[in-house]
């Protein structure tokens, strides 16, 4: 088989099963409204949960820092790219979340990959929730460690896997809020089981940080859990981009030596770090609390209004509200029907989610108003298929 044949066959297979991904060009993709092709849509696809991507205080912080530092960091943090803005943000995050250290990464994908590939060795075992993010599972598969996956949120299955003999160390991997189902992990029980088996716990709280818990400290804080490795990302609740790993002093020093994604990548722009500090200040303020309260009320309004006879609504109380429709083509038709009525929603299909669970992944944000939720419900219940 030639290279071209391999490429063509893979694309043909995706088209045949209605799983071919595509990008949409938008003029505005975050906030209450999405603008594409000159038309305005109510935006139910953005991860900008607190509406901070448009916050004037955060925008101003980025602009002022760009004037001071320029638009790029100029190199890896090990060379010349670790600025006072990066240092300040790391210290603020560590203090906020109660960890000795925080290390910044250019993305959540990079942070997850870096931690797992740096820590895990031959004869080690990774025990991950089967619905863990692709960045976590790919890193586990690429590492020399053995990967075992437990049934989603099934702590008994997790315990059985950890009980089986292992020569090396064990790492339990889970998420705070799951990106496709919108539900939360039983973190307290998972941590208890991990400690009983002398395993470390890694929690990716990409969709919980900033949005839940006291001062927005996330799912782990809310559940009274402190994993050895906490990954937080900044493209959701923070409204910007990037990520950080919270850990002990010694683990931070270890990652600075052996995490190749950190050592060999250009640091995020200092202006981005300063904007993230401004975002953190908003998240921790009374305004941040008000934004979280409004979002929670909108989620409750949506869940109360969905017609359960037409859609399968998962037990999710986060900003992520998936409607399971099952068939790939039906999910695509429903997303298109919503767009025709002015609501932008995304159809999620395999391999992102299991076969037979294609869905509309609806995300609600603080930028929405109650009337927007009512309009979404009206369109959903009137959508012809």
Curated annotation (Swiss-Prot):
Q: Which reaction does it catalyse?
A: 6-carboxyhexanoyl-[ACP] + L-alanine + H(+) = (8S)-8-amino-7-oxononanoate + holo-[ACP] + CO2
Task: Identify the domain of life.
Answer: Bacteria
Q: Which coenzymes or cofactors are required?
A: pyridoxal 5'-phosphate
Location of N6-(pyridoxal phosphate)lysine modifications: 236
Alphabetically ordered keywords of this record: Biotin biosynthesis, Pyridoxal phosphate, Transferase
Q: Does the keyword Transferase apply?
A: yes
Which pathway, per its entry? Cofactor biosynthesis; biotin biosynthesis
**Positions with a binding annotation for pyridoxal 5'-phosphate:** 108-109, 179, 207, 233
Which Pfam families does this one have? Answer: Aminotran_1_2
- EC number annotated for this UniProt entry: 2.3.1.47
Return the broad EC class.
Answer: transferase
Name the residues that bind substrate.
21, 133, 352
Q: InterPro entries annotated for this entry? A: Aminotrans_II_pyridoxalP_BS, Aminotransferase_I/II_large, AON_synthase_class-II, AONS_Archaea/Proteobacteria, AONS_Proteobacteria, PyrdxlP-dep_Trfase, PyrdxlP-dep_Trfase_major, PyrdxlP-dep_Trfase_small
Q: Does the keyword Transferase apply?
A: yes
GO terms of molecular function: 8-amino-7-oxononanoate synthase activity; pyridoxal phosphate binding
Question: PANTHER family, per this entry?
Answer: 8-AMINO-7-OXONONANOATE SYNTHASE, CLASS II AMINOTRANSFERASE/8-AMINO-7-OXONONANOATE SYNTHASE
What family does the database annotate?
Answer: Belongs to the class-II pyridoxal-phosphate-dependent aminotransferase family. BioF subfamily.
So what does this one do? Catalyzes the decarboxylative condensation of pimeloyl-[acyl-carrier protein] and L-alanine to produce 8-amino-7-oxononanoate (AON), [acyl-carrier protein], and carbon dioxide.
Quaternary structure and partners: Homodimer.
Q: What is this protein called?
A: 8-amino-7-oxononanoate synthase
Specify the species.
Salmonella paratyphi B (strain ATCC BAA-1250 / SPB7)
Q: What does UniProt list as this organism's lineage?
A: Bacteria, Pseudomonadati, Pseudomonadota, Gammaproteobacteria, Enterobacterales
